[in-house]
């Protein structure tokens, strides 16, 4: 396997993706570099589904090592300590946009491990690892609806700066990590926004910096789409340079399309009424009553399809709530 790499420029930062050099036994292995920060991300997925499993067993782990900073662990045993809060948050950051991006029905056990090889205290590794994880899954041939691109946007001196260094972040008022994918039109859809103000944001605003108004934040999100598109394009370029394994991945169907369609035709209006109830307890009780009613109507005692009925009903509720959020920009939960 030859070493291949792709470099893209996000703002004034270069991000390099490389594969074919480390962790060659892993189906998907990517080293992502920005400055002197290097992260190895490996992805592995079983080709079979564990019997009886009713969820997607995705594991994301971030391994920080003292050698990445050129240090030896302290303490008597000279061993690495427990996972830091930063590493835990990085795991969640990687998991959130990727988990819903897998093909519907994909239940094969999947593992993503990001190992921090080196840090330069200027370029954070979390967003880099997220992009590399998306690329690693593609190299492993794991079925995704769309690759994920992610970028950190920081409000510095009243301007949105992508992938700001830690030195630049000292002047930041507001920061966002934005992840997106490509829709059928080839346009970027935002799938995750994680945002927060800096520790001394109020002091900076009092000193004359712009506050992160709704319009300003919307501009930042809109600006991120260009960078997300470039990152996804860089991933696609590296994938095209490698032989991706073709695997017939098994997809699990929790319920038939006919069952869901019948339930939707018969009960969608009732679900819409129930989800509009503002009292949480009353809404929950009404939903449980309707679920029992649906189960009684469609149950097949010979096949024991109760679980499939409940999952189909749950899917209907989920879709109705989602449509309500999008159409009304409102949710009472």
Feature roles, as predicted:
Residues 143-269:
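Mobile "lid/hinge" segments at catalytic clefts and subdomain interfaces of large enzymes
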Residues 54-61, 129-132, 310:
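Conserved glycine-bearing catalytic or ligand-binding loops at nucleotide- and phosphate-handling centers
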Residues 73, 77-79, 93, 111, ...:
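Small-residue-enriched alpha-helical segments and adjacent helix-cap loops
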Residues 14, 26-111, 116-123, 194-206, ...:
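Glycine-rich, flexible beta-strand/loop modules in the N-terminal catalytic cores of phosphate-handling
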Residues 2-18, 115, 120-124, 151-154, ...:
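Conserved mixed alpha/beta core segments that line enzyme active sites in large multi-domain catalysts
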Residues 1-46, 50, 147, 247-331:
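Extended amphipathic alpha-helical scaffolds
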Residues 97, 128-140, 220-223, 227-231:
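Stable alpha-helical structural segments in soluble proteins, enriched in small hydrophobic residues
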């Amino acid at each position: 396997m030859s070493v291949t790499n792709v470099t893209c420029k996000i703002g004034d930062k270069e991000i390099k993706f490389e594969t074919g050099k480390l962790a060659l036994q892993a189906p998907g292995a990517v080293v992502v570099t920005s400055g002197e920060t290097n992260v190895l991300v490996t992805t592995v997925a079983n080709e079979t589904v564990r019997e009886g499993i009713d969820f997607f067993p995705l594991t994301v782990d971030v391994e920080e090592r003292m050698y990445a900073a050129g240090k030896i662990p302290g303490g008597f045993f000279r061993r690495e300590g427990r996972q830091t809060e930063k590493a835990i948050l990085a795991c969640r950051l990687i998991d959130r946009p990727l988990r819903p991006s897998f093909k519907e029905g994909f239940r094969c056990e999947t593992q993503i491990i990001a190992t921090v090889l080196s840090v330069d205290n200027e370029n954070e590794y979390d967003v880099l690892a997220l992009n590399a994880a998306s690329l690693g899954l593609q190299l492993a041939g794991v079925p995704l609806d769309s690759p994920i691109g992610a970028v950190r946007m920081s409000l510095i001196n009243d301007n949105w700066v992508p992938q700001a260094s830690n030195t630049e972040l000292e002047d930041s008022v507001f920061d966002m990590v934005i992840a997106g994918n490509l829709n059928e039109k080839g346009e970027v859809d935002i799938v995750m926004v994680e945002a927060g103000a800096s520790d001394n944001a109020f002091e900076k605003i009092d000193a004359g910096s712009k506050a992160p108004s709704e319009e300003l934040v919307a501009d930042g999100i809109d600006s991120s789409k260009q960078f997300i598109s470039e990152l996804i394009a860089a991933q696609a370029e590296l994938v095209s340079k490698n032989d991706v394994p073709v695997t017939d991945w098994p997809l699990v169907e929790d319920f038939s399309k006919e069952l869901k369609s019948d339930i939707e035709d018969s009960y969608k209006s009732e679900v819409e009424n129930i989800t509009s109830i503002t009292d949480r307890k009353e809404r929950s009780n009404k939903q449980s009553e309707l679920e029992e009613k649906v189960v009684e109507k469609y149950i097949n005692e010979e096949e024991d399809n109760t679980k499939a009925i409940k999952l189909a009903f749950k899917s209907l509720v989920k879709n109705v709530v989602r449509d309500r959020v999008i159409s009304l920009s409102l949710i009472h939960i």
